[in-house]
Swiss-Prot record:
Pathway where this protein functions: Steroid metabolism; cholesterol metabolism; Sphingolipid metabolism
Gene from which this protein is expressed: Gba1
Protein name, entry field: Lysosomal acid glucosylceramidase
Regulation of protein activity: Inhibited by conduritol B epoxide/CBE.
Catalytic residues, chain numbering: 254 (proton donor), 358 (nucleophile)
GO annotations of cellular component type: endoplasmic reticulum; extracellular space; Golgi apparatus; lysosomal lumen; lysosomal membrane; lysosome; trans-Golgi network
Provenance organism: Mus musculus
């Protein structure tokens, strides 16, 4: 109760303002609400404007239903609050941020395009415009994955080692590519694309199937590996003809998946030694000798595999010279402490970027695929993002941008959740708590922002991270996964004190000018 009273008095002097359009909430019986959007209405946010010097902006989302609501307060010359003090240390700098985003899978594209054009536009605007959460990363699967409705690659003609029959199907030309172009037009920020393959054509594989235990035939340096490396270049060539260029490719989506008998959907197995030699002899040279200025990210699998996978690949100078970064997935994070994996990998290879390339909830066998309005799932996202940022990761990529209420479509029924769920019969979509949790980072932390130290005066259950934006302003994100309200003060040594309170089950983003 005392904490609630403190929070009440702290914000008596704060003026409230709301985004351009408030949320229309709807409960589906879970812990919080979704925001309902249709052809005629969708909640939106104002473009980010820096508050006047000496004041701060606070964006708040709560389990009780606030969604990135803006308030403005004054930075005080003297501290008046008690309890937790978070001190910004801007001189202690860490990694620079690449960005935040999600994946344009076949399933995502099918769901978006099943909506009416006005509703499609509002969905894309929610993700990519200044009135939305301003994603700047899009992941693109190279050909089919489990979130497709059919199985295909770009070169299914057997023994076509010249890739003469390589071609993009309508999933790319009619679905994904047009939507990516729409996103690019809506965005005020440069959007970086990265691509990942799930499987090679079956005629290049030891098991002759898209799924199950199987890897490339032969040995690195041979015609099978060279053809597969050239397939990457063909993909980049094909997308370039549609005016799309890629920031990066990953060497393989979850390369360990293809090492398991009975793996249910598209995969291609690599050990770390196999990936090392494929990169050094085939993929690295193929990309370097192409016309594309594209980065190569290794691993693209669970961080549980670190640091060993990085040690195997990057200890070989011939492979290391082609590797820009290490991509990680989140699914086994509960078995892999960040310090022992991400932290140790950064210690060993401080000049190789770490990048979170896939995450979703609802994939584990004990989880319900979709839980409309789950606040806990939003907190799982923001907890992961903060943890990753604190351990040198430069960006965080969600999985499907939009799914249906079942969590698909997915050809092997591997249904999962998504920040946006599309209700096709109603020509509507639902923005979940996950969407807003992601927005607390993506909208306010543009590419080039740099993490700095933020030191707590005492042990706390709050999870926090601080960054300096390219414009010199400061951003602090505070996540409270507990039920208790927590009074706190943020100290900027050059300016003064931000007196505030973190309500139970909330996430806040603070933004202020430093000069």
């Amino acid at each position: 109760m005392a904490a609630r009273l403190i929070g009440f008095f702290l914000f008596q002097a704060v003026s409230w303002a709301y985004g351009a359009q408030p949320c229309i909430p709807k409960s589906f019986g879970y812990s919080s609400v979704v925001c309902v959007c249709n052809a005629s209405y969708c909640d939106s946010l104002d473009p980010v404007t820096l508050p006047a010097l000496g004041t701060f902006s606070r964006y708040e989302s709560t389990r009780r239903g606030r969604r990135m609501e803006l308030s403005v307060g004054a930075i005080q010359a003297n501290r008046t609050g008690t309890g937790l003090l978070l001190t910004l240390q801007p001189e202690k700098k860490f990694q620079k941020v690449k960005g935040f985003g999600g994946a344009m899978t076949d399933a995502t594209a099918l769901n978006i395009l099943a909506l009416s054009p006005p509703t499609q536009k509002l969905l894309l605007r929610s993700y990519f415009s200044t009135n939305g959460i301003e994603y700047n990363i899009i992941r693109v699967p190279m050909a089919s994955c489990d979130f497709s409705i059919r199985v295909y690659t770009y070169a299914d003609t057997p023994n076509d080692f010249q890739l003469s029959n390589f071609s993009l199907p309508e999933e790319d030309t009619k679905l994904k590519i047009p939507l990516i172009h729409q996103a690019l037009k809506m965005s005020s920020r440069p959007i970086s694309l990265f691509a990942s393959p799930w499987t090679s054509p079956t005629w290049l594989k030891t098991n002759g199937r898209v799924n199950g235990k199987g890897s490339l035939k032969g040995q690195p340096g041979d015609i099978f590996h060279q053809t597969w490396a050239n397939y990457f270049v063909k993909f980049l060539d094909a997308y370039a003809k549609y005016g799309l260029r890629f920031w990066a490719v990953t060497a393989e989506n979850e390369p360990t998946a293809g090492l398991f008998t009975g793996y249910p959907f598209q995969c291609l197995g690599f050990t770390p030694e196999h990936q090392r030699d494929f990169i050094s002899r085939d993929l690295g040279p193929a990309l370097a000798n192409s016309s594309h200025d594209v980065k190569l990210l290794m691993l693209d699998d669970q961080r549980l595999l670190l640091p060993r996978w990085a040690e195997v690949v990057l200890s070989d100078p011939e492979a290391a010279k082609y590797v820009h970064g290490i991509a990680v997935h989140w699914y086994m994070d509960f078995l892999a402490p960040a310090k022992a994996t991400l932290g140790e990998t950064h210690r060993l290879f401080p000049n190789t970027m770490l990048f979170a390339s896939e995450a979703c909830v609802g994939s584990k066998f004990w989880e319900q695929s979709v839980r409309l309005g789950s606040w806990d799932r939003g907190m799982q996202y923001s907890h992961s993002i903060i943890t990753n940022l604190l351990y040198h990761v430069t960006g965080w990529t969600d999985w499907n941008l939009a799914l249906n209420p079942e969590g698909g479509p997915n050809w092997v029924r591997n249904f999962v959740d998504s920040p946006i769920i599309v209700d096709i019969p109603k020509d509507a979509f639902y923005k979940q708590p996950m969407f807003y949790h992601l927005g607390h980072f993506s909208k306010f932390i543009p590419e080039g922002s740099q993490r700095v130290a933020l030191v707590a005066s005492e042990s706390t259950d709050l999870e926090t991270v601080a960054l300096l934006r390219p414009d010199g302003s400061a951003v602090v994100v505070v996540l409270n996964r507990s039920s208790e309200d927590v009074p706190l003060t943020i100290s900027d040594p050059d300016l003064g004190f931000l007196e505030t309170v973190s309500p139970g089950y909330s996430i806040h983003t603070y933004l202020w000018r430093r000069q």
